[in-house]
Design a protein with these regions (language model features):
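Single-pass alpha-helical membrane anchors
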Residues: 1-22, 58
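Ser/Thr/Pro/Gly-rich low-complexity linker/stalk segments immediately outside membranes or between
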Residues: 20-34
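Local sequence-structure signature of Cys/Sec-based thiol-disulfide redox active-site neighborhoods
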Residues: 30-68
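Extracytoplasmic/secreted envelope proteins and their assembly/folding machinery
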Residues: 31, 55-62, 82-86, 115, ...
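Beta-strand cores of modular interaction/reader domains in eukaryotic scaffold and signaling proteins
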Residues: 39-42, 70-73, 96-100, 108
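Thiol-based oxidoreductase modules, predominantly thioredoxin-like and allied folds used
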Residues: 43, 62, 66-83, 112
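A short glycine-leucine-enriched loop at secondary-structure breakpoints
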Residues: 87-92
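Non-catalytic, surface beta->alpha helical segment in thiol-disulfide oxidoreductase systems
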Residues: 93, 98-125
């Protein structure tokens, strides 16, 4: 019985480590983190009502799409890194979703704000 439980535990650990996850980034490291990648980036403010509605759907989509999506918290507008990144990408309202390819803005996502719509869009990028 212990051997079976041990085996199940190992399988669980394997599944846990192999699952797809998004990656984390920050305003200061975004440019380096997405270098040579095409990703959908969410710029959000924790105090924004629309951001609070979107974030759970974003998180579900990010679990499926892994490193093709990243959310950047830009709540602290007094932070120099936040100022730099929001100026660079002309972020004036929240939430804003941009497709960035090799650090350059290629388009703004204007579609539905649901897990399925986000996943479908990212798969088509």
């Amino acid at each position: 019985m212990q051997l079976v439980l041990y085996g199940l535990f190992l399988v669980f650990l394997l599944v846990w480590f192999l699952r797809t996850e998004g990656f984390t980034s920050s305003p200061g490291s975004l440019v380096e983190d997405i270098k040579n990648k095409k990703v959908l980036v969410l710029f959000y403010n924790k105090d924004c009502g629309h951001c609070k509605t979107l974030k759970p759907e974003w998180d579900k989509a990010e679990e499926v799409m892994g490193d093709k999506m990243v959310a950047i918290d830009v709540t602290d507008s007094s932070n120099e890194e936040v100022k730099t990144i929001t100026t660079k990408y002309k972020i004036n309202s929240y939430p804003t979703m941009l497709v960035l390819y090799n650090v350059n803005n290629t388009e703004t996502y204007e579609g539905e704000r649901t897990k399925d719509a986000l996943v479908s869009y990212v798969q088509s990028m």
